[in-house]
Amino acid sequence: MEFDFDVHKIFLEPITKLDSSLIPSRRPLIASSEAQKQIMTVIDEIGKASAKAQRLPAPITSASRMQTNKHHLYILKDCTPKTAGRGAVIGFLKVGCKKLFVLDQKGSHIEAEPLCILDFYIHETLQRHGFGKELFTFMLKNEQVDVHHLAIDRPSEKFLSFLRKHFNLWSTIPQVNNFVVFDGFFRDWKASVKKTPAKRTEGEIKPYSLTDRDFLKQEEGLPWPFSQSQLNLNRASSLGSSPTRACSRHSPGEEDFVKSLRNCRPHSLHRTANSEQEDHSQRRRTSSLNRPQSIHH
């Protein structure tokens, strides 16, 4: 892919790595403001070409996206003599770490943050010339990552064929998201991974916790005489008889107590309480009258 400016002046190396600053490790040979503008143009154009090749509705690689994400962009330029004039861009590879929930071979959910292949493009006229393998191998060495530990975002069939041919990646582990991981992804894993606990089924959910159950067992019983009826209820339940019949039977002492409560009238109880208060106040007056007076000399 050619441009109307000199690519060799902004990309001094065969493969240039860019981050969110869009500044190459080796400074361009032109002014920084002009170099920044040209670099942004290259990123936008190769992003559009990649989206068109993958039949995407919109580019997933652009200068603005690079500036707002912690991604790494590897740009491969053509260094052959035929492009010695202004140069040309062959393709690019975009990677970045993402937090994912991936499934292992046993179906367990694993929380991981692997390096992900987010976009990969080689110009149509320069494919099957070894440029893709050169770019991919350079990225693996620079990121210091094993090819089996990569997660790939929505790879095309052509990309999967490329990985099988050059990196012997055949067997994949089925996932529920758009990422593809290969057999060996969890082998010799160096990054931090975290297994999420499996969700309990409805049958395993208890109505009370153990502490609640212990608390319910330690509840105090009802005071006498109501505790006797409760005891009879428990005995009847344990023997298999009807609890209603057990509750209807009362002991002789309990029957007398219940009858006395029924026959006792509220106003008579109130009168008795008032008479007790009057007697108590009368005793206090009498004691105060009988108390000897103090003698003053």
From Swiss-Prot:
Which PROSITE patterns does this one have?
GNAT_ATAT
Keyword Zinc on this protein?
no
Query: For bias kind Polar residues, which ranges apply?
Result: 287-297
Entry EC number(s): 2.3.1.108
List the molecular function annotations (GO) for this entry: L-lysine N-acetyltransferase activity, acting on acetyl phosphate as donor; tubulin N-acetyltransferase activity
The UniProt entry's GO CC annotations, sorted and at most eight, read: axon; clathrin-coated pit; cytoplasm; focal adhesion; microtubule; spindle
Family annotation (InterPro entries):
Atat, GNAT_ATAT
Enzyme class, UniProt record, top EC level: transferase
Assigned keywords, A-Z: Acyltransferase, Cell junction, Cell projection, Coated pit, Cytoplasm, Cytoskeleton, Membrane, Transferase
Reactions mediated catalytically: L-lysyl-[alpha-tubulin] + acetyl-CoA = N(6)-acetyl-L-lysyl-[alpha-tubulin] + CoA + H(+)
> Region Disordered: start and end of each range?
269-297
Domain N-acetyltransferase as annotated: residue spans:
1-186
UniProt subcellular location: Cytoplasm; Membrane, Clathrin-coated pit; Cell junction, Focal adhesion; Cell projection, Axon
Q: Where does acetyl-CoA bind?
A: 120-133, 156-165
Marked site, Crucial for catalytic activity, at 54
Biological process terms in GO annotation? alpha-tubulin acetylation; neuron development; regulation of microtubule cytoskeleton organization
Matching PANTHER family: ALPHA-TUBULIN N-ACETYLTRANSFERASE 1
What does it do?
A: Specifically acetylates 'Lys-40' in alpha-tubulin on the lumenal side of microtubules. Promotes microtubule destabilization and accelerates microtubule dynamics; this activity may be independent of acetylation activity. Acetylates alpha-tubulin with a slow enzymatic rate, due to a catalytic site that is not optimized for acetyl transfer. Enters the microtubule through each end and diffuses quickly throughout the lumen of microtubules.
HAMAP family the record matches: mec17 (MF_03130)
What is the designated name of this protein? Answer: Alpha-tubulin N-acetyltransferase 1
Source species of the chain: Xenopus tropicalis
